[in-house]
């Protein structure tokens, strides 16, 4: 390098991409994909803080999970969720019976709770129960999503019929009511079906998340294929579109509209839709944005996002082209037995609150920081498989001698 012609990059990045200094690929991305101030100035970047809640929190022999979008009716917050009231832990496909669940969201119903402040909740009871034996949705109802449309309320949910099948194969059902407190009237057939046996969503369509957008009702959902091989699409998200809440819902020809993500979490933002993408896929743990509701772009990378989040967005169904974002919601936290910590032996979940700054109407600099550090307990958490087990340590030691070599040059 000829230092006589070298001009260093300035300590304070210019607002616009400079043309008088050489830019590496990373610095070009800073201007083309991100913005010079970094995370602190990114509207769609946030940390997440968590709080326990009362009324629907951690309770022995009860599992609560997968909360809906939260709505506010007459100054009261409402949320719906999957509830399994059963002191028998999930037993898998082989151990399931009419009274023993296969998984944590088996033998479940849709319940609801209300709150005045979002922290203290009162469980109000069952909203939608499983169907009578032999009818659609007689085994389990789970992962609900709520829609408010023309003064009516619509719940969409996974509807399992008969004993559990391999790979969580299921369709999306629906119920409606004139009041958030019910009674709810069941629509006894799927509103969104699975794809074909070779399609990306051929096994499951679940986690429905309704939004009203550009005069249409959009239901985003998580899909997974029948093929569970290493090359198969593990999970992605799609959207089905209708003119009215009862359908017919037509799947977008662009599905899947994400290449990553587990549970769905979307909200209106400016003139488009934002989405929290977590857990699965190459773009996991990001916030993404789409102006048309179909084509999403990564806008930020986030740390420890909420699991199965249901956000409060007062304009979720406003369709006004001016989405204001979100500041809080509910999520679920899993608890399980540590007797066999590295097996899939989920026992139950409970609901918790998350707070964030993905809003245009507030400013919380304390939620825009980076360089997050975690405690010893997090790094060595055996439940999350962060700590090596004794058997894993022994296997590594046994193989290490044949893999590791003396440092080159010594």
Annotate each language-model stretch with its function.
Residues 1-410:
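Carbohydrate-active catalytic/glycan-binding domains of CAZyme proteins
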């Amino acid at each position: 390098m000829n230092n006589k012609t070298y001009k260093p990059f300035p300590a304070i990045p210019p607002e616009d991409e400079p043309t008088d200094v050489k830019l590496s690929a990373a610095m070009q991305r800073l201007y083309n994909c991100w913005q010079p101030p970094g995370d602190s100035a990114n509207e769609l970047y946030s940390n997440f803080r968590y709080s326990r809640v009362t009324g629907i929190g951690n309770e022995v022999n009860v599992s609560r999970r997968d909360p809906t979008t939260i709505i506010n009716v007459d100054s009261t917050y409402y949320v719906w969720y999957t509830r399994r009231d059963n002191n028998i832990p999930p037993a898998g496909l082989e151990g399931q019976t009419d009274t023993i669940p296969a998984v944590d969201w088996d033998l479940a119903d849709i319940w609801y709770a209300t709150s005045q402040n979002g922290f203290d909740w009162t469980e109000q009871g069952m909203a939608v129960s499983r169907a009578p034996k032999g009818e659609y949705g007689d085994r389990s109802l789970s992962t609900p999503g709520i829609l408010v449309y023309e003064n009516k309320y619509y719940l969409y949910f996974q509807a399992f019929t008969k004993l559990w099948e391999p790979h969580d194969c299921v369709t999306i059902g629906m119920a409606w009511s004139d009041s958030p407190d019910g009674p709810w009237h069941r629509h006894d057939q799927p509103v969104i079906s699975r794809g074909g046996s070779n399609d990306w969503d051929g096994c499951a369509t679940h986690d429905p998340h309704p939004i009203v957008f550009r005069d249409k009702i959009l239901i985003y959902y998580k899909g997974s294929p029948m093929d569970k091989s290493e090359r198969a699409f593990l999970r992605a998200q799609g959207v089905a579109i209708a003119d009215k809440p009862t359908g017919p819902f037509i799947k977008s020809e662009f599905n899947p509209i994400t290449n990553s993500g587990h549970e769905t979490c979307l909200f209106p933002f400016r003139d488009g839709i934002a989405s929290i993408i977590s857990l699965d896929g190459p773009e996991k743990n990001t916030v993404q944005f789409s102006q048309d509701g179909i084509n999403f772009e990564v806008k930020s990378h986030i740390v420890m996002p909420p699991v199965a989040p249901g956000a409060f967005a007062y304009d979720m169904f406003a369709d006004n082209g001016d989405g204001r974002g979100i500041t809080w919601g509910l999520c679920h936290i899993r608890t399980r037995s540590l007797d066999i910590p590295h097996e899939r032996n989920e026992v139950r979940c409970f609901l918790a609150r998350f707070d964030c700054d993905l809003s245009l109407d507030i400013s919380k600099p304390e939620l825009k920081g980076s360089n997050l550090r975690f405690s010893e307990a997090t790094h060595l958490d055996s439940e999350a498989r962060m700590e090596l087990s004794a058997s894993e340590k022994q296997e590594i030691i046994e193989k290490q001698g044949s893999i590791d070599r003396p440092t080159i040059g010594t």
